[in-house]
Amino acid sequence: VGRKPLTRSLGLEEAGVKTDPDSGHIVVDASYRTSIPSIYAIGDLVPGPMLAHKASAEGIAAAECIAGKPCDVNYNAIPAVIYTWPEVASVGLTEEQVKALDIPYCTGTYPFAGAGRARCMGETEGFVKVIAHGKSDRVLGIHIIGPRAADMIAEGVLAVEFGASSEDIARTIHGHPTFAEALQEAAMAVQKCSIYAS
């Protein structure tokens, strides 16, 4: 089950580019440099989620490394999106991962049925879940099932990338009526101050 990089027929061994014998991924360092210093690899050829936006971020980072600039991709801040109905989007850690890592945490959820825009448009299926560190309140993960999830996750990516707290999201003024208010309400639920949650 899943996908694997198709590297075995590329002649990489003959070129001297090392691959992982089990996964087929090209072995790279933190700069995306392969075992041949003038060859770089990104995207589906290297470990990590096989997503176009992850490959784009790695391509930019590799170019920055080649130019001698600092380069980094925060793999914890790469969104995953499933284009189904309803849409599914997530970034950061899941509640199961947080539990397995024994990290103290709090969660807040909010149903789209409580968002005025969702009700007006008849798109009330799903909810938003915010997972925050139990002591620092730093956002650890955001998960959305529902309308516009693919677009809404961008705010969650920013929160994870820049170490925002659930309070930061809760205190950010969101337009009304919007689907994004459900994210604000979920963050407010972490803070136990949701306005519309029952």
Residue ranges and their predicted role:
Residues 1-66, 159:
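FAD-site-proximal beta/loop scaffold in flavoenzymes
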Residues 48-56, 64-97:
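Rossmann-like dinucleotide-binding cores of NAD(P)H-dependent redox enzymes
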